[in-house]
Every structure is written in C-alpha cells, then in structure tokens.
Regions:
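Small beta-barrel nucleic-acid-binding modules, principally OB-folds
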Residues: 48-63, 188-200
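HotDog/MaoC-like acyl-thioester-processing domains
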Residues: 3-4, 55-141, 200-204, 214-245
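Acidic/His-leaning functional-site neighborhoods
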Residues: 154-239
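Hot-dog-fold acyl-thioester-processing enzymes
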Residues: 1-53, 99-103, 107-191
Length: 245
C-alpha cells in the first residue's frame, strides 16, 4: 500500500535561494512515513518498540521552490531479519523531483537491543515491491576515515531533539547543509546523497564536529562526510554533484 501527503512549501521549508533545503526535503518524506505508520507506531510504542533509521540514499533531480505544491509518497518494500526497507518519492505535479530508499532497524526500547521484525509487518503496512531509486543500500560501504579537509562546529538546539531525546533524523541534513554552506559548497548541485546513522545524538550532546573531503570525477564532484564528537561517530555519508561539463 502506498500512502501520500500533499502540501505547499512554506517559508520554513526554503533556504536563501527560495528552494527547499535538504533538511526540509527529508522532513516532508518523514511526514509521509509518519502518516503510514500512525496505527502501527501506536501499537509499537505501547510495547516499547520503535523503528530506527539506519541508512538512507536519495536521488534529487530538482529542488522545489517556495509555494510549490509537492506530494510525498511512501511504501513498505519488504522486511528481513532485523531490517525493514521503505521507499519514497517526491512529486511536484507530474514531475518526480526526488526519491529515496531507506533501511530501518526494529528496536526494543525496554531491552535496549535490536529485535527481529515481526512476521506480520508486511500485512500491517502492505507490501509494494518497487525500489524508488535503484540504489542497493546493502552494497554501500560508508567511509569512516575522512581527512577532515573541511570542518564546521555544530551547536545543537532544543528543537533538534525528538520525544525520545535524540536528534531527529532529518536534522542531520540541516547539519550537513551547515557544513557545506560554511565551506563554500552549493547544496543545490547535489544529485545523490547517502547517509548511515551510526549512533544517535543524545540530548546531552551540546555540540559536535561535521567534516568532509571532496574528490573530482569526470561525471561530477563527489564528497564524503562524517559527524562526530570526542571519538564517537554519529553519522557517515557521501554525496555527488551534477557535472559542470
């Protein structure tokens, strides 16, 4: 079963160029999966279970602009072992402007450990066997050894944290945007982006470092990044930019 939400972009969604920011784009997708998971999430919360985002990969063809109406669609692709796979598409009218593939872990809050995904998950969510991006997230091996060619210190805010006292998944993309902007990169050129959530940022973390390095390629520049603090890595990832040729 596919679930969609539609809304117009407002001033809180856009950046200085009137285009949707990376963080806002992923918040819109997050709203769609929240709608899909409302009933199941309530049952899970009552038993101390939660979905935890482990990996995400996205293709961005165009960043929608202020007042543009967008539709975010999501579906459950399948689950296996400790993991569930969820897909997303973002449309502006008939134009698909972005898509994402995600891997989620099933977590027992009371026991503080992962659990196998319940066998009736597919029945609850409905299964749609379509990959929105064509990206195999299981084959991706994130790089952790980054040269810190560019760095930015990030200060967390109370509004960054969700009811579980962790930084919200979409806020990591706000942190990435800060890293890119402060070091002279144009996030509007990004065409693919992947992130692995290595460890949750707890509410006691007042600040962290974001670092990246870039590499040139014939088909456009690429970059790898990480977010960390005092030897603890919170997230790692990569992006590719459109070619200027």
């Amino acid at each position: 079963m596919k679930v969609s939400i539609t809304r117009a972009l407002n001033y809180f969604d856009i950046g200085m160029d009137y285009r949707i920011t990376l963080g806002a784009l992923f918040r819109v997708l997050q709203e769609a999966s929240g709608r899909h998971s409302d009933d199941a999430e309530n049952a899970m919360t009552a038993t101390g279970k939660r979905w935890v985002l482990h990996r995400i990969a996205a293709r961005i063809d165009r960043l929608p602009v202020y007042a543009e109406t967008v539709t975010a669609t999501t579906w459950h692709r399948f689950s296996r072992g400790f993991k569930a796979y969820r897909e997303y598409e973002l449309h502006a009218g008939d134009e698909r402007v972005a898509a994402a593939t995600t891997v989620w872990l099933y977590y027992d809050l009371d026991a503080g450990r992962l659990r196998k995904v319940p066998p009736d998950t597919g029945e609850k969510y409905g299964i749609v066997d379509e990959c929105a991006t064509g990206i195999d997230l299981e084959a991706w091996k994130p790089e952790n050894d980054i040269a810190s060619q560019y760095t930015t210190r990030i200060t967390t805010r109370p509004t960054d944290f969700d009811p579980l006292h962790h930084v919200n998944n979409a806020v990591y993309f706000d942190y990435l945007l800060a890293l890119l902007y402060r070091n002279g990169f144009d996030a509007g050129k990004i065409r693919t982006i992947s992130m692995q959530y290595d460890r949750q940022i707890e509410s006691g973390v007042a600040s962290l470092e974001a670092a990246c390095e870039t590499r040139s390629a014939a088909d456009g520049n690429t970059g790898i990044f990480k977010m960390y603090n005092d030897g603890t890595v919170f997230a790692t990832g990569k992006w590719t930019e459109q070619s200027t040729s």
